[in-house]
Swiss-Prot record:
One Pfam family this sequence matches: YidD
Main location (coarse class): membrane
Signal peptide (from-to): none
UniProt topology in membrane: Peripheral membrane protein
Role played: Could be involved in insertion of integral membrane proteins into the membrane.
NCBIfam families attached to this UniProt entry: membrane protein insertion efficiency factor YidD (TIGR00278)
Key words, A-Z: Cell inner membrane, Cell membrane, Membrane
Name of the protein described by the UniProt record: Putative membrane protein insertion efficiency factor
Species of origin: Shewanella sp. (strain ANA-3)
Family in the record: Belongs to the UPF0161 family.
Domain of life: Bacteria
Subcellular location: Cell inner membrane
Any GO CC annotation of this UniProt entry: plasma membrane
């Protein structure tokens, strides 16, 4: 069953996909992480919602610079505090 997206989630992921299609090919591969920052952002928005997902994406983008070693950095799982 397909998961529904809010209009803000759709807008954010469409913006990121536009970046992936139109801007990223012009810049070439620069991300030091796996998954790339744009894929990370889309996954974070899907898992955590628009606000928290964009916050995770911003923190990730700020870490993506030549002085950081990079490597594998998956999206953290959603923490359902109500289930504990």
């Amino acid at each position: 069953m397909a998961q529904t997206q809010s209009p803000l989630q759709w807008l954010a992921t469409t913006f990121i996909r536009g970046y992936q299609i139109f801007i990223s090919p012009l810049l070439g591969p620069r991300c030091r992480f796996n998954p790339t920052c744009s894929h990370y952002a889309i996954e974070a928005i899907k898992v955590h919602g628009t606000a928290k997902g964009c916050w995770f994406a911003l923190k990730r983008i700020l870490k993506c610079h030549p002085l950081h070693p990079g490597g594998s950095d998956p999206v953290p799982p959603k923490n359902d505090r109500c289930n504990k």
